[in-house]
Amino acid sequence: VFSLFLSFSSIMNPFDCPMVSRRGFLAQTGLGLGGLLLGGAGRAGETSPLIARAPHFAPKAKRVIHFFLNGGPSHVDTFDPKPLLSRYAGQLLPGDYRRTERKTGVAFPSPFQFKKYGQSGLEISEVFEKTAAHADSMAVVRSMYAQVPNHEPSLMLMNCGDSVQARPSFGSWLLYGLGAENQNLPGFVAMCPGGMPIKDSENWQAGFLPGALQGTFVDPQYREVDRLIENIRSGHATVSTQRRQLDLLREMNGRHRDSRGADPRLEARLESFELAFRMQVDATDAFDLSREPASMREMYGDTVHGRQTLMARRLLERGVRFVQLWHGAGQPWDHHESIEGGLRAQAGQIDGPIAALMTDLKQRGMFEDTLILWGGEFGRTPSVELAEGGASKLGRDHNHYGFSVWMAGGGIKGGQVYGATDEFGFKAVENPASVHDLHATMLHLLGFDHEQLTYRHAGRDFRLTDVSGEVMQSIVA
């Protein structure tokens, strides 16, 4: 949405005008903690949805970072070891284990070794060996399940709590409940290197919530702030001129609303203009990794995933509430074939950065109030996927009946496993956990009763967890 901000030829980059300091920028624009939150805020009847608010009760976590492995990571190759698959190698699995989206064949043992880590003895695959150093801080939920084995609805369910209807995303609900801590940065940032995941910006949409609560997309394949957030700066007007133009837009939008009714899309676009305007100073600082010590940049790694994870930490410590790190455009974890090479490569891209983030947060005293979530939209089958002619593709099909996520940090009791899939890893059988249960647990850690965090729309109260959801109390510290 930020590419829309400077499509007005006269909205301009203050850095191309006589240089303006941060203090001067805020003074000229009336921004900052005591100033305008949104260009027209302060006018009669207008309030900002970004004003900071208290949760329902004392939170254990203040912020969230979500590592989203889009495509569906295989749980039986990462955090849910199933040694019995080796005994059945080359044989059809007993029971009802062939109800899969595509044709699958015999049992497919994991090509990766699992080891016990930490005092807890948590079993983790060799592909996440560096992350496993933090095993005693992690709670692995091995009994997740979704509704269908398709990417699009499962992405919507995991992100927005509904696989069918367009609903606000988790980050938008969090901003709705808490407001923004830093008014000059987006409260919700979604990073995806190389483009968009499937369903594009619907994954971080505000839905029927105010447009200011939508996620801000950043492409971390770039290093320059002008490319990280497209058109965040321009070259056609002074700061004061930009402010007057945005005020004019807001006035025109108000007239349109008065005569034709509110249009959420128009409001969302204008809010994106306002936020982009405010970000011109703070975003430059937050995304400038050269300000980090060389040792810190080396710890995270000079790779796209290392850089985006370090950017995420810089955003979190500057008050961003929710940062979602997608692995890449499309569905990179969709390992229908050649899973051994593909999964090893992709796990290797994020294993080091995840471990570095956890170490870094602990050193900074941020780990205890930062909730970390790792996972995808579903898991994968314990049986091998077959090609049209019946040959093995050496990969796994989609599996929504059972998969794993893990959490760490803010309010999580680490070094434990919640729930279980069956002996082959096909279906959640012990303490099955729905996506609504996951969302309810996360909201609880952030200080919210998920049943009370509601928004009135179309004549009824909506919530992220719809009409279900139970907190997984045993993993709450």
Indicate residue ranges for each PLM-predicted region.
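Ligand-binding pockets and gating/stacking loops
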Residues: F2-A477
